[in-house]
């Protein structure tokens, strides 16, 4: 039992790191090629796995896409200017759109909904969440992201549930 739990945690953690290293590595190559041609590209990652909350994670991960969704989806919807309920709805819409953007599959849509719900929950409960020690919040954030990334790996929602139940 303990071996299978350790195996499960190890596999999922490695997949989280694989996604980061693959994507961040591609960005690093693009930065290098850009510098060769005297083109400075915007930073796209800022140590996302050091994030202390899911909101902090999304401020650090794929920052150019986050800026795009903020500018062209969140702000036109009203951003946070129309009250808390509308803000929460706007956050959910942005993450839903992000899920669809990543792929036309229910796994990506569920990934967007889960991340949107986590962001909304953090906004609602941040007063209490911020009392948790920083290192524990970092661990919780990493575990959540690892859980959510499994939806990228799964071919179907049913397969994702199988992965989560192992």
List each language-model region with its residue ranges.
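Membrane-embedded transmembrane alpha-helical bundles that form the catalytic cores
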Residues: 1-166
